[in-house]
């Protein structure tokens, strides 16, 4: 999986890693619904699974 920045500005394969405005504020997966396309919130980052 790949880690992305808090601002979601890293792009993988030409596409944003997660939607604009998506930020993980929790240390767990409570905000995972804000990350789409297989990305999940973990440790305040959106990770690709």
UniProtKB/Swiss-Prot annotation:
Give the principal location in a single coarse category.
secreted
An example Gene Ontology cellular component term from the record?
extracellular region
Mind listing the UniProt keywords for this protein, alphabetically? Disulfide bond, Neurotoxin, Secreted, Toxin
GO molecular-function terms, A-Z? toxin activity
List the subcellular locations. Secreted
Expression by tissue, per the entry, reads:
Expressed by the venom gland.
Q: Which InterPro entries match?
A: Hwtx-2-like (IPR012625)
- SS bonds (residue pairs): 4-17, 8-41, 22-24, 35-46
Coiled-coil region:
none
Which superkingdom? Eukaryota
- Cross-referenced SUPFAM superfamilies: omega toxin-like
Spell out the family assignment given in the record's similarity comment.
Belongs to the neurotoxin 12 (Hwtx-2) family. 04 (lasiotoxin) subfamily.
Reported function: Toxin that causes irreversible contractile paralysis into adult Aedes aegypti resulting in 100% mortality after 24 hours.
Further comment: The primary structure of the mature peptide is identical to that of U1-theraphotoxin-Lp1a (Lasiotoxin-1) from Lasiodora parahybana (AC P0CC18) and U1-theraphotoxin-Lsp1a from Lasiodora sp (strain IBSP 8539) (AC P0CC19).
Q: What is this protein called?
A: U-theraphotoxin-Lk2a
Upper classification of the organism: Eukaryota, Metazoa, Ecdysozoa, Arthropoda, Chelicerata
